[in-house]
Amino acid sequence: IKMGYEVAVVGCGNIGLMAIAWAKAFGAKRVFAIDIDDAQLQLAKEFGADVLINSTDIDFHDEIRKYGNGVDLAIESAGNPFTAARVLGLPHKGGEVVYMGIPYADVPIPRFYFERIMRNELHVIGSWCTISAPYPGKEWTNAVEYIGSGKVDVLGMVTHQVNLSEGPEMF
């Protein structure tokens, strides 16, 4: 994410909320939050989203196009086969798509969306949070710095506090 980017985040669960917070911390000009749950969209606003789109009734592709020719970066964090295909239609020519959500079903990609990769010369990237090589990796250094300084606020994700012994019941 570069200063001034326009970013779309599809799926506003924990991964999406953090993607929104990081986008704003890195200087995104406008962040679109896309979800089917109004409560999650309100959380997305608290994490810095500028435009909230409930895709239950609105085509998020058409809605984003009202603001220009597409975003610089589209992040798929829902892990939904439907959105995994549709996210390819959000970036402008030369834009990026990052897949962070993990689908638990096959992802059929209609020809229109698959062609967006070639016709728009998209950069498609997968992201997986794990330890990098060589051990110890440095991927958490920035996270600790940004969270510790308050540039990225994670406290909004805390909705309940329970005793450790109650943990198994929560799941």
Whereabouts are the PLM-identified features?
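Short acidic-hydrophobic, aromatic-tinged amphipathic segments that line or gate anion-handling sites
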Residues: 51-56, 159-166
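Beta-loop-alpha module in the N-terminal Rossmann-like domain of NAD(P)-dependent dehydrogenases
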Residues: 77-85
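Helix-to-beta-strand junctions that scaffold the AdoMet/dcAdoMet cofactor pocket
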Residues: 91-93
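Acidic carboxylate diad motif detector
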Residues: 100-101
